[in-house]
Structures are given as structure tokens and as C-alpha cells.
């Protein structure tokens, strides 16, 4: 009777365990395999979240000093006391770099020779993320242009100690801009906002609140941003104008020798020149071929009256105040006086004549000495809260991607077991 019963099927065939059938390596040729979860999806998601975190939250939240126009019964005039000599400088010129992918068309030597031929004393070869010091005539100072982001928020770093390769790649908010300004300012002697108006790189709101920068290219070869300069000054931010060509082709006369800065320094030594820029002993010039047909002779304050004298006589001398409003214009003179009104918080001067347009730095009200602006401060509770929120969100996204990948893998395995 026992011999007539069919043998029990324990799942053992040809001496193999049924677990062996689940191994893709043991499957018969041509049989469907059971794919593993696609881990690359998880890794790709993790990388995307990391890049997004860097671009979105790799910075603190700041509290900015409230705009407060200059005030006081005294005046700070950057052009006093007198002394030193005037030097011609351009800190924004690009030479060939990075295998020709970016920057200028000419070599560093050619760029230096071009400016030397136009009588420049100082040149800054401000290539992107590259400091050049290759020539003594004209003096080449350590400078570079920082910025590789969709919003075109760029900086001109002069007297650079090192290159900051970090940047936020997307359109930057004001907190990201402040974070970069603080990093760049700590690694340089003079920090400028480059062409602030170009493609919305910086708004007038930004420059009126940001701290840790010395000035801006209110007038450059590619963009004029006087309204931005006046916005900062009207908010009580003492910022100097440093004009430059921003030339990418030194052989182009329409782009080279069209905007530069005159600096009154004790000597051509780099320390003296950078100190003069920081003090505001400069004025910007527009012209052609680097030719200076009219120059500032003096800018003095006495008993509430600002006196400007030029050599030779100017076509016009215009005094501009709070909000960028022209307060007074005088024509065909070599000397003009302006009496500060009670509501004048600052006055800056523009001079036209002999094929040039000059932009003087402002004289501002103060209670004594140079007015200082408080620095933006980190709001730690908001910053930590933001970081935690985005960390939780990022972990959730990565976990969801991992679960999705596992479900897809399980589905493929189940389908592979289904008899065809």
C-alpha cells in the first residue's frame, strides 16, 4: 500500500534546494533574472538634494541695519587733507585665461602693454578666479572677478589674498549675497560690487542694505549704475565709486580706455594705493583712449560750502544729492560753490568737459569723522530653523526615492516569477 502512494514533493529536484532557483546566477540560460534595486536612482537623488541644499540653504539668515541717511552738523570730505599725487588706474580688464573658455582675447602681456601705451600707472588683470602679477609697468595689482551664477551677481576683488572658488549658482537672494560679501571682504583689501545694474545682479534695494563692501562700479565700460550708487548713499551707506573698462578685448578702442579711476595716493606702492581707495581719494572718469582732458584740481569744504575747481574750465559742474536729485548745475566755469541745505545728507559732483565725464565721491554729513555703518548680523534662530527644515525635507526626499526604487525592484522581481 505504501508502495502505491505517490512520493511527497518536498521541492527537491536534481538535488537542488528551491532557494537556488531564486539566484539569477543559477537560472537556466534564457530564463528571466531578478534585477536588483537601481541604487543609482538613490545616489542621483542624494546628489541632487546635496546640490540643491548648497544652492538654496548654504548660508545664514541676516538682519540688516535699517537705512538711515547721513546726518550731523559736520562734514566728511574724502579729498581732505591735500597731498599725494594722482595716478591713473583700471582694475577691471580681462586677458586670455582658462584655455580661452572665458575672460579676454589678448594675452596678459598684451593687455598690460595696451594700458601702458595709454599712460596708465596701475592695471588690475581681473580674470575670473585668477590672480595675475606679471608686470611692473604699469603696476599689475592682485585682483580678480568673482561670480559664476545665473543672476550675474559679480564682485571685483582688489588686493586679493586668495581666490574664493565658492559661489551660489542660481539667482541669489540678499542673504546669499551678504554671505559672499563677508567671505570676500575678509580675503581682500578692497571689495567692489561689479556692474551692479547688469542683468539685475544687484538691486537698488540690495546695495542700500548690504554691508562688508567698500564701493561699486557706479560707472563702468559696460553699464552705468549711478542710481544704485545714490540708493546706497541715500540709505547712509558710504560707498565709493571705482570705475573700470571691464574690457575683454584690449584691441577694441570702444571697450578699452573708456572708463578708469584717478587715485590720489602717497606713492604707487600697493599699500598706499589701496589705502587711498579705501579712504575715497578717487574719482571716476569716462573718456576715449584713456585721455584726460579735464582734471579735478581741488574739492574743499569750508563753513558748509563745497567748492570744486577744475583744470581747465568745465562745460558743466553738477551737484547731486539725496535720492540722486540734481541740486545745482553751473556751466562754463573752472570753479563752482555749493552751500549745503538743511535737508542735504550728502552731495556728490559730476563734471563734464574736454571729452570727459568725471564722477567725484560724495561729501557726507557726520557728527565727527568718517561715518560708519553697522555690519549685518546673523539671525541664528532663523538660520538654524531654516537649516533644520531643509534637512528634514532633504532626508524625506532621499527616503522616498529609496522606497520608490525598492518598490520598482520588487515589482520587476514579481513579474519575472510569473509564468509566460
Predicted regions and their residues:
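Short glycine/proline-enriched coil/turn segments at helix->beta-strand junctions
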Residues: 135-139, 186-188, 237, 313-315, ...
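A metal-dependent hydrolase metal-coordination microenvironment
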Residues: 30, 54-205, 209-211, 218-231, ...
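C-terminal functional module detector
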Residues: 2-82, 98, 249-420
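Catalytic-core segments of hydrolase enzymes
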Residues: 216-217, 240-242, 257-259, 266
Amino acid at each position: 500500500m505504501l508502495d502505491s502512494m505517490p512520493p511527497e514533493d518536498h521541492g527537491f529536484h536534481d538535488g537542488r534546494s528551491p532557494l537556488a532557483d531564486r539566484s539569477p546566477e543559477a537560472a537556466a540560460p534564457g530564463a528571466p533574472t531578478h534585477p536588483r534595486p537601481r541604487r543609482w536612482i538613490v545616489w542621483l537623488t542624494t546628489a541632487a538634494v546635496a546640490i540643491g541644499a548648497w544652492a538654496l540653504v548654504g548660508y545664514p539668515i541676516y538682519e540688516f541695519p535699517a537705512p538711515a541717511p547721513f546726518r550731523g552738523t559736520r562734514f566728511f570730505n574724502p579729498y581732505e587733507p591735500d597731498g599725494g599725487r594722482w595716478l591713473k588706474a583700471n582694475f577691471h580688464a580681462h586677458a586670455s585665461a582658462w584655455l580661452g573658455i572665458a575672460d579676454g582675447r589678448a594675452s596678459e602681456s598684451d593687455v598690460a602693454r595696451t594700458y601702458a601705451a595709454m599712460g596708465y600707472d596701475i592695471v588690475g588683470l581681473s580674470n575670473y578666479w585668477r590672480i595675475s602679477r606679471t608686470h611692473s609697468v604699469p603696476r599689475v595689482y592682485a585682483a580678480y572677478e568673482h561670480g559664476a551664477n545665473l543672476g550675474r551677481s559679480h564682485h571685483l576683488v582688489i588686493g586679493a589674498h586668495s581666490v574664493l572658488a565658492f559661489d551660489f549658482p542660481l539667482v541669489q537672494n540678499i542673504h546669499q549675497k551678504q554671505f559672499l560679501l563677508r567671505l570676500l571682504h575678509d580675503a581682500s583689501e578692497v571689495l567692489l560690487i561689479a556692474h551692479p545694474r547688469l542683468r539685475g545682479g544687484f538691486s537698488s534695494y540690495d546695495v542700500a542694505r548690504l554691508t562688508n563692501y567698500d564701493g561699486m562700479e557706479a560707472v563702468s565700460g559696460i553699464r552705468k549704475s549711478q542710481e544704485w550708487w545714490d540708493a546706497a548713499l541715500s540709505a547712509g551707506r558710504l560707498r565709493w565709486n571705482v570705475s573700470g573698462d571691464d574690457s575683454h578685448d584690449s584691441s577694441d578702442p570702444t571697450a578699452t580706455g573708456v572708463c578708469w579711476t584717478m587715485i590720489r595716493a602717497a606713492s604707487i606702492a600697493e599699500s598706499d594705493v589701496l589705502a587711498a581707495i579705501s579712504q575715497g581719494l578717487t574719482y571716476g572718469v569716462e573718456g576715449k583712449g584713456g585721455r584726460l582732458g579735464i582734471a579735478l584740481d581741488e574739492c574743499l569744504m569750508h563753513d558748509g560750502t563745497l567748492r570744486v575747481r577744475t583744470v581747465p574750465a568745465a562745460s558743466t559742474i553738477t551737484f547731486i544729492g539725496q535720492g540722486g536729485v540734481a541740486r545745482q548745475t553751473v556751466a562754463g566755469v573752472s570753479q563752482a560753490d555749493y552751500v549745503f541745505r538743511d535737508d542735504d545728507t550728502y552731495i556728490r559732483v559730476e563734471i563734464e568737459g574736454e571729452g570727459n565725464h568725471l564722477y567725484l565721491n560724495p561729501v557726507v554729513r557726520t557728527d565727527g569723522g568718517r561715518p560708519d555703518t553697522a555690519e549685518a548680523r546673523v539671525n541664528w534662530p532663523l538660520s538654524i530653523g531654516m537649516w533644520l527644515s531643509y534637512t528634514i525635507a532633504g532626508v524625506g526626499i532621499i527616503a522616498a526615492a529609496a522606497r520608490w526604487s525598492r518598490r520598482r525592484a520588487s515589482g520587476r522581481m514579481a513579474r519575472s516569477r510569473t509564468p509566460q
